[in-house]
Regions:
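Sec/Tat-exported extracytoplasmic proteins
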Residues: 60, 75, 83, 139, ...
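C-terminal subregion of chymotrypsin/trypsin-like serine protease catalytic domains
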Residues: 225-339
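N-terminal activation segment of mature serine protease catalytic domains
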Residues: 15-64
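Intrinsic N-terminal pre-sequences and regulatory tails
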Residues: 333-346, 358
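Serine endopeptidase catalytic core focused on the charge-relay Asp
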Residues: 51-60, 65-204, 226
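Short, low-complexity, Pro/Ser/Thr/Gly-rich segments in the mature regions of secreted, periplasmic
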Residues: 351-365
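Active-site region of chymotrypsin-like
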Residues: 52-54, 156-179, 184-187, 191-278
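Secretory targeting and sorting signals
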Residues: 1-15
Length: 365
């Protein structure tokens, strides 16, 4: 009699943590424990209250001469680097699942984006700047090439779309503008507004411009693709109203690795995997959980009374104005001190004036 050997069933692959359009998170190196409130009180903050929110771009494998293949995910620079005015971030990137954050990779390349370019205070810098980052995917992390997303409240639009290749445009010279993509369709998946589709209206060396994709905070870095063939076109970068700018995917590969124009698809291959995605936490669920934790940590904190704080702010401004007037009468006029006082008290009065108005409006709704 032949003995039959029973083989163990193959282990199922873990759900994909790396997925185009999925949420991406980053934490500060040393998150502050408290925040100073305008009332002078301190608000205790949990670590998760400092999480940086972005979305994942296209993922695949790099094939570079003389090097081992490397799995990477492409996204926006401002999603993987410390932004001005914010705590320094770790070089570790996570996806939210349940109440946890699961690590999936680390930054291996990116360009520098100035504060003036990101906050649109220098429009020409905003137009010209590149905005790209490359995240190496950790060993053992499952990825999928299916682009999809859920919006802030968990809403879903459309079906998963396979990312097939990179749209390798002719590389434009600095300052050159082209409309060879005018009217071509473009869709994006992002972790805040989900999937939206629109039309391309033009491009520059480091920008694919569209009208109506409506990026908002948290969508940054997410994949932009051509719905006709699944080609990755860009990653969400910045917006001015309905005008959106995506960082071209082909320029990421060219800039980061010196790949010649027209050779991008030889150097980067989107993953063939169609593994099911992890059940990512929506941004709304995450915000609700973090807000509840902040309330728990500050249960003894007395909420401010806007009208009372406004009265205090006005009284303080009057007192300092009287003191400065007395000093001026004694020949001790200091323009810098006066400007500092004006700016400080204007900010305080404006803040509490707005809060008081908001409180009154809320009472009438």
């Amino acid at each position: 009699m032949l003995a039959l050997q029973v083989l163990p069933a193959p282990a199922e692959a873990a759900p994909a943590l790396v997925a185009p359009g999925a949420p991406m998170r980053v934490f500060p190196q040393d998150p502050p424990k408290t925040i100073d409130l305008p009332t002078g009180q301190k608000l205790t903050m949990p670590r998760d209250g400092w999480v940086g929110t972005c979305s994942q771009g296209p993922n695949g494998t790099l094939h570079l001469p003389g090097k081992e293949p490397q799995r990477v995910m492409l996204t926006a620079s401002h999603c993987v680097n410390t932004m001005p005015g914010f705590p320094e971030v770790k070089n570790e990137f996570y996806a939210p699942v349940g109440t946890e954050y699961k690590r999936f990779g680390e930054r291996v390349a990116s360009n520098h984006v100035t504060a003036e370019a990101m906050n649109l205070s220098d429009p020409m810098q905003s137009i010209r700047t590149a905005d790209w980052g490359v995240v190496r995917i950790d060993d053992g992390v499952t990825e999928t090439g299916l682009s999809h997303s859920r919006d802030f409240n968990g809403g879903v639009q459309g079906e998963p779309v396979k990312i097939t290749r990179v749209r390798d445009f002719r590389t434009l010279a600095p300052g050159e503008v082209s409309v060879d993509n005018f009217g071509q369709p473009i869709c994006k998946d992002g972790a805040t507004t989900g999937r939206t589709c629109a039309k391309q209206i033009g491009r520059t060396r480091n920008g694919i411009y569209s009208w109506g994709l409506n990026y908002v905070q948290g969508d940054s870095g997410g994949v932009n693709y051509d719905p006709r063939d699944g080609a990755a076109v860009g990653v969400s970068s910045m917006t001015l109203g309905p005008l959106g700018k995506a960082q071209p995917v082909d320029r990421i590969i060219e800039d980061a690795y010196g790949i010649p124009d027209g050779k991008v698809n030889e150097a980067f291959t989107p993953t063939d995997s169609t593994a099911p995605r992890e059940n990512f936490t929506t941004s709304g669920e995450e915000e609700e959980r973090v807000s509840a934790e902040i309330e728990r940590l500050n249960s003894n904190l007395k909420p401010p009374a806007p009208r009372e704080e406004l009265r205090k702010a006005v009284d303080n401004a009057k007192q300092e104005a009287a003191g400065l007037a007395q000093k001026a009468s004694q020949g001790q006029f200091d323009p810098a001190e006066v400007n500092r006082a004006i700016n400080h008290h204007s900010d305080r009065i404006g803040y509490w004036g707005g809060a008081s108005l908001g409180e009154e409006i809320a009472k009438r709704l």
